[in-house]
Amino acid sequence: MENSETPNYPEGRDLLKGKAVVITAAAGSGIGFATAKRCAEEGARVLLSDTHENRLAESVSSLQSEQFEVYGIPCDVTKENEVQELLNFAISKFKTVDVMINNAGLGGQSNLIDMSDEEWEKVLDVTLNGTMRCTRAALRHMIPLKRGVIVNNASVVGWRAQKGQCHYAAAKAGVMALTRCSAMEAADAGVRVNAVAPSFASHPFLEKVSDPLLLEELEAQEPFGRGAQPWEIANIIVFLASDLSGYMTGECVSASSQHP
């Protein structure tokens, strides 16, 4: 199948019209930025966060040039105080947070016998603990209001074994469990928590941290013979963030034919 980079979704649907959306790891050209753009196209007011301040500023400027209401603030999800500052900033701009999209994650390639404690802990602190911190902060705001949506970025490796991915797979499996359990805790308040699990999405971060031979192998496993484009994952996130998925909570949507 042709690897088209041109989105073919209908525009102007306003699925998130007026919603206040916060997205972590949203700078650059990956899933986070694609999600920010799609949310803005659907009428949302969007706050981007990232640890890369220059890329963040460029991403915000790019979206603002299209007349979207977009802001940016640096945030390291491994630091609880910065996560709280992120929520506080969003509330100062939007008066509320309707949707929290937890996209921050960290991977790598290392067999367990060669992995240091530091490598293991770094991946889990960003990918799992960071998602927990953002989910917790968002729920503390949303539950009293009895409304809100959280969407987490998981991965099919949370279901499926893969060599060299013990740390990342454990973290993403944890994100899935966190999604299910927090969804149960928040359901009485009408707050929904779901996740998307991409299989293989082509973006610069993955290309930077992965073995090229592994990427070729992963691409060959895909039924379409290619990785997903970031906007293709972003469309699923928009669906989960919108009222179209209003009766879904605690679910992890596989963006692949390979589950599990």
Q: Which residues does each PLM region occupy?
A:
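Short, small/polar-rich loop/turn modules that mediate ligand/substrate recognition or access, typified
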Residues: 187, 192, 248-250
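Substrate-binding pocket helix/loop in short-chain dehydrogenase/reductase
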Residues: 111-112, 119-124, 206, 214, ...
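Active-site loop immediately N-terminal to the catalytic Tyr-X3-Lys motif
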Residues: 110-113, 160-166, 188-189, 225, ...
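Catalytic Tyr-X3-Lys loop
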Residues: 106, 113-132, 147, 151, ...
